[in-house]
Amino acid sequence: MQFMTNGFLRGLTMAGALFLGLGRASLSTAETPGAGPAADARGTIDQPLQQKIEALAAVHKGRVTLYATQLNTGKTVSLDADRPVQTASVIKLAILFEAMEQVRAGKARWDEKLTLAKGDGVSGSGVLTFFDTPLTLTLKDVLTMMVIVSDNTATNLGIDRFGVSAVNARIAWLGLKDTHLYKKIGKPATEPMPADQPKFGLGKTTAHEMETVMERIGRCQLAGPGESAEPGDEAICRTALTMLRNQFYRNTIPRYLEKLDSSETGSGIASKTGSLNAVRNDVAIIAGKSGPMIVSIFTDENEDKSWTADNEAEMMIARLAKEIVETWSPAGLDGKALVPGLGLDAGSSSGASK
């Protein structure tokens, strides 16, 4: 996983080069096939596409949960989108969002200094654990490492800076009921753990709730209820999007959608992955020529636990993303549109109700 050593080895390899049937992909009652396009609180179900993704997910040897929406049209598709799942490293999006809000409030600065001390390093994905200590880094450097190479040591530095309780308070502020950060990675818990922590590990979420977090980042919606956008919001969101569009792990959602790698500019995809042995996840903002999309896909109980490039769950995520994006944006991607706000009005389509 990006969260454990074998995933890290996979990441280094990449760096060197730069349900068991339909019943397991169960549908919510709002997603009954054959009923024609239907409206729910989140948008309008794209019924033909819904049937295609159901068929794709039905052959996967594991479980798939998914929520995707095209923001300018309100079209949606989903599979079991409200079932709580293991986040693995996708929970790092919530840490990033809390950092953005604290920078906005003047309680943190991108250029503030954090110190990596002896004993801070943890195993798993990332490279900071191999650096000599003490080492001084900026907050921006730490969060960049947390996002683009899913650095676990950097993640813990971020958690130390903001606190587990602050991240969870922010999650509650967003109105999310089934998303939670439990603890630092590879370190003992410093507070009593909820009863469900052993089941979920580092964090839990749903495909729909993590779509909400990524959509807030893409739309640059940092203001709370009754608050107005501030002049500095765009710069904060641009910094976060730069991290996310330079994502190093690109074998899942980006796999069939573009040929750019993380060393090249202009990617139309900003994403965060998360992996454990039997878990593979990816959540992305995708700047399509026909309009921006958020695609949130989680897989668990996967039979294929390998760390090879053709891992079945990673291939499944890639195929689902390809089907969604090529249906909603047949002309392809537009990297120039991956900017704060995504070219949308502040209250347009699905985001206004979240």
What is each residue range found by the language model?
Residues 63, 135, 156-222, 227, ...:
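Mid-domain, small-residue-enriched loop/turn segments at the edges of structured enzyme/sensor domains
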Residues 74, 86-114, 295:
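Active-site SXXK
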Residues 48-81, 293-297:
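A short, well-structured edge-of-sheet supersecondary motif
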Residues 71-72, 110-127, 162-163, 184-189, ...:
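Acidic helix-start/capping segments at beta-turn-to-alpha-helix junctions
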Residues 11-24:
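Bacterial N-terminal signal peptides
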Residues 119-156, 164, 203:
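Conserved catalytic neighborhood of penicillin-recognizing serine enzymes
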Residues 2-13:
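Bacterial N-terminal signal peptides that target proteins for export
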Residues 32-56, 161-163, 213-257, 261-268, ...:
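Structured C-terminal helix/loop/strand segments within mature extracytoplasmic catalytic/sensor domains
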